[in-house]
């Protein structure tokens, strides 16, 4: 049975949607025989309330999350999903290709609460796939 992986990240520009699509495709090319990727861009339509409910339902079905953490700070919705998934005991792998630091100090990738919720934060798609493979193998 395939494990469900929730792909979290901002979806407010074509560039963000294209990047999310690229991440999903890369993950599935390497691990598609073992996982199913749930991406809000493909499941969510309607009012803000319907979007919220469908995303929470999808999060509840997934034990693993990939969180896109690029930008001057983490997207608000992504940060909420990270916290929710962490509180439910899920494993979160962040990907941050943005070379700007967005945390409390020079060694922080992002906000301490988001960073502390992730089992790892990686900087490339190859490292993301490798980390997901380790989680699936454990």
Regions found by a protein language model. Give the residues of each.
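Conserved catalytic or regulatory cores that recognize and/or transform ribose-phosphate-containing ligands
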Residues: 1-138
